[in-house]
């Protein structure tokens, strides 16, 4: 008797009767490689329905999509980073810059082009342009600034290809840097920031457009091009360029600009914009320049990894168990399971192709929980692992005694198996070993020894072996060492001696940020909220479109479409810059000192960063990552080299041919990493993830088939699984399996169950207050010299040296000195007897 095709009803399989061979399946019925095979038809009715229901629960919102060929890096390709600086509305200004340069150039050089001059002539003209920035007339100064911008843009009017433009850009920018252009631009930028007339005019305007920020945009464009180009290293760079790069990086991170690093000036612009005092500031350009400045001065992720390894060796810690960047790059994305409807559809298409057999339920569970995602190259390995109990070597983990047809022969490339071994080495904290020993002692001996991790007297042999294994995988982080050292300094301030604080760029930047760090974090999150695609336009929200909206709004449908693409792209670039800045600062501060990181992280949490990021992901994340908000023919440098074709609605809708949008995927990964940084080892913040119902939001993000993004989503799901209840864990077994496969294991972490000691009532306030007290003590000890304990300060007992000290009095006090004497000295009665006693 034949089973009903595709139906989940009762199945009767007669294994005694010979079955006719199944007809060859149609080509369309083949499932894509990696898709789970439809097994629902092999079950009795009730179990099939239950299986389908569980499938639907676990894979709600999943769909089969191709792996995204995305490689995470500090930045996108150089050309892409250059093009994102300019909005499409700024297009006509390229020709204005060229015109300003050529008018000035023809006065001094009549018979040659810029590209035909020698190095000395280039340097002479660059210095002449630099002198022109010092004129008082605003219009003349703007023309000279535009001419310098044209030089920084690669004098594209004399180039025939994009590669030639980029080559001349590098040459021209190092030339401009050599003659001191950047410092002159910083002074001009400072002047524009303090330009109260422009600020008050912008505040009064009902609608701010591109024209209100012309001067600022030109200056920021040149500075961005200098920072971005100098930061990019090329193999063909001259030796003097490499030296200039190192010098420039050191200067950019030093407190040379108003006694603070250049990044602090840009942070000040961000807060001034958010406070409403300067609504005309071109925020996208400010944020892009801020990101590249932080990246250039502090270093990128690979540099951070080498700094981390170096710091561990200085502190006497063992090397890192693996290079996390390399591990993540070698990971493959997990295939999301097909939904129940997909399974039924595949089964109907397959028809009577396969013999049916009854399968044990526990084997089917094992089958469903598997997540094959790595191609295996040899059949021999698979055969060797057949009698292993693990699921690694078997394509289908089914019992040998079941009646099964021979497997279909697939091409070698289509065969999928699990990877051999887990990607990460497990880690154990000192605290975990202490807790394990404490529970073992109280269980077997009846008393505890506190933090003693060496005494194992009276404990059974298996416990000895467990402790040995735990100690083999013990990992001490730099943060733990720094926290212990800080406790020691506070416990014994005299015997501990003076702390030697190395003035690395991260330390200098933190000292500059410290007085106003909460305001900076709130300002960045305000702009992030305004730029998020999920945020609704509100009257009280800040206007981040000042540097993209033209003076005259579009009148045709085509112009409106172009502006719509431009506005969306503008918002995406802002999200990209803010997410990158926050992540870089968190990572560098954590390496420099854990309490610097905790201070910044706590202010992000207090400013509602966690719900803001969850709100960002509460959208169709797949459509955000594949959004086509770009017009490639209008991107720089393509638009200045080639003739612009006539734009049509079809060409605007088509966008580029890329499988995904690099900047959007980069932003999503950064935001997930920030969320991980904020919640890691923080029980109270993990509970915020649970309270804000983040699990379904994060699970939807697993649709994106990109290994790095999936890893950080799974990490966030892992920390909250113990609080989500047994039913959630039961109906999300595939997600649990993916966590097991991809996320690092803590050997005695009970993450998959609800019986952990940490699953205690939520006391957010106590945990955060204790952390805040530690941070305040650290900041007061290291940076707040005014509030130092007077008992520990040196005392000068010499009368002559005390009277000989010069005291700087403010000017207004000196002018009104007589008045002060009259009020504070002569008019007040003095009891000389009491004073002399």
From Swiss-Prot:
GO terms in the biological process aspect are: cortical actin cytoskeleton organization; cytoskeleton organization; negative regulation of hippo signaling; regulation of cell morphogenesis
Note down the stretches annotated as region Disordered: 1-67, 333-423
The protein's role, per its UniProt record = Plays a role in the regulation of cell morphology and cytoskeletal organization. Required in the cortical actin filament dynamics and cell shape. Part of the striatin-interacting phosphatase and kinase (STRIPAK) complexes. STRIPAK complexes have critical roles in protein (de)phosphorylation and are regulators of multiple signaling pathways including Hippo, MAPK, nuclear receptor and cytoskeleton remodeling. Different types of STRIPAK complexes are involved in a variety of biological processes such as cell growth, differentiation, apoptosis, metabolism and immune regulation.
Q: Which PANTHER family match?
A: PROTEIN REQUIRED FOR HYPHAL ANASTOMOSIS HAM-2, STRIATIN-INTERACTING PROTEIN 1
**According to the UniProt entry, which residue ranges have a biased composition of type Low complexity?**
36-46
Region entry Required for STRIPAK core complex formation: which residue ranges?
796-837
What compartments host this protein?
Cytoplasm
Record's protein name: Striatin-interacting protein 1
Q: What residue spans carry the Acidic residues bias annotation? A: 378-391
* Entry-linked SMART domains: DUF3402 (SM01293), N1221 (SM01292)
Q: Which InterPro entries match?
A: Far11/STRP, Far11/STRP_C, Far11/STRP_N
- Per the UniProt record, the source organism is Homo sapiens
Highest taxon in the source lineage = Eukaryota
Recorded GO CC terms: cytosol; extracellular exosome; FAR/SIN/STRIPAK complex; nucleus
Q: How does it assemble?
A: Part of the core of STRIPAK complexes composed of PP2A catalytic and scaffolding subunits, the striatins (PP2A regulatory subunits), the striatin-associated proteins MOB4, STRIP1 and STRIP2, PDCD10 and members of the STE20 kinases, such as STK24 and STK26. The STRIPAK complex can be extended by adapter proteins such as SLMAP:SIKE1, CTTNBP2 or CTTNBP2NL. Interacts with CDC42BPB. Interacts with CTTNBP2NL.
GO MF terms listed in the record are:
protein kinase binding; protein-macromolecule adaptor activity; small GTPase binding
Q: Which UniProt keywords apply?
A: Acetylation, Cytoplasm, Phosphoprotein
Q: Which residues carry this modification: N-acetylmethionine?
A: 1
For the modification Phosphoserine, the affected residues are: 59, 335, 339, 788
Task: Provide ranges: composition bias, Pro residues.
Answer: 18-35
Query: Gene for this protein?
Result: STRIP1
Task: State the similarity comment.
Answer: Belongs to the STRIP family.
Ranges of Basic and acidic residues compositional bias? 47-60, 356-377
Identify the taxonomic lineage of the organism of origin: Eukaryota, Metazoa, Chordata, Craniata, Vertebrata
